[in-house]
Amino acid sequence: MKIVAPPTLPIRPVAPIRAITPAARAIPGSGLPDEKGTSSLQVSRFAAALVQHSRILRERELIASRNALQSRAVKLGELYQLLMSTSDTGLDNAARLLRKKLLQDNDADLEQVLEFADGDAAKAHVVLQAARKQAEDDGAEEEYAALTQTLKHLRRRFGPRARAGINTARAFGRQNIDNKRRTALRNLYGVAVSGQPNVTGLIEALIGEQQEPGEFDLNLRDMRRAIADDLSAITPSASHEQLRTLMHGLTTARHVTTLLRGCEHLLGRMRKKNPKLTVDPPAFLKHMLTLTANGMNVNQTLQLTQHIGGNKLEHQLAFLNGLRADADATADPALAGPEKPPGRAE
């Protein structure tokens, strides 16, 4: 048996193993880059930039805060001027007088604040805010705390009335509105938004405020502007539905101006027939609105006829003939009571 040697396997050359040299690490303070390619000098510069940026941001925040406080103070002063008469000495002086009064009485009572503001919740709110800011700036901590509590009490008790006065300050603060008329309109508006909408009652009150011909139309216009401002405010004094109901009622009641002119003309003719007649047109129209809203009966018609026409039958008939057109005009659904705006279910 012949023995055969195994075949020779090919020998392949082996590549030599390279020696791995460790990377040189940056020595602190040498300025050489580290493993991430960032040198200590770059880190220092970045840290300094962060500090500078933070300082700039803080300065901007302080400036913005200071400007916001100044802007708020200016707006508070402007609001106070709209609420007060042109002869007033200013918000700062009013706030100091209020603080002096409360310190003398040793009691920051809400009733005293309202008395100082002539019973106006909006004025009291503005002056209290200014007085509290003065106390804070003066470092009077106890006075500041007392005024804060009084302000909270005012907001809880007269929140809607105060908000109504603030929201409508610009509408009622125009230069063509005298102080007496401004006060009357603001009081009427506060009453109108503090309860259920009563368009008839509001219109009758506006008629009663007329001192000279044409003033009712101006009052009606100013009241609509006030409602529009209140509706657009961030925090309205009443619900949007209630304010829209009042707006709709006042808008549809613009024809009352025509009714007033008709009453003036009718009463003017009747005074020639009945010299003892002393009824003025606003009072006569208010009476007619009340009668038509409740349903005018025979006895009421007879009493009114005798009162206006006098004792002579021909004068009474003349009054009834002149009254017919006015009575038909006053029978408007918008004057019969609270009404929902169009498109709303009863």
Curated annotation (Swiss-Prot):
Q: Which GO terms describe its cellular component?
A: cell surface; outer membrane
What keywords were assigned to this record?
Hypersensitive response elicitation, Protein transport, Transport
- Which GO annotations describe the biological process of this protein? negative regulation of protein secretion; protein secretion by the type III secretion system; symbiont-mediated perturbation of host programmed cell death
This protein's source sits in the domain of life called: Bacteria
Statement: the UniProt record of this protein carries the keyword 4Fe-4S: no
Against InterPro entries, the record matches this protein to: HrpJ-like (IPR010812), T3SS_LcrE (IPR013401), T3SS_TyeA-rel (IPR013351)
Biological role: Involved in the secretion of a proteinaceous elicitor of the hypersensitivity response in plants. Also required for pathogenicity on host plant.
Which family does this protein fall into? Belongs to the HrpJ/YopN family.
Q: What is this protein called?
A: Hypersensitivity response secretion protein HrpJ
What organism does the record attribute this protein to? Pseudomonas syringae pv. syringae
The coding gene here is hrpJ
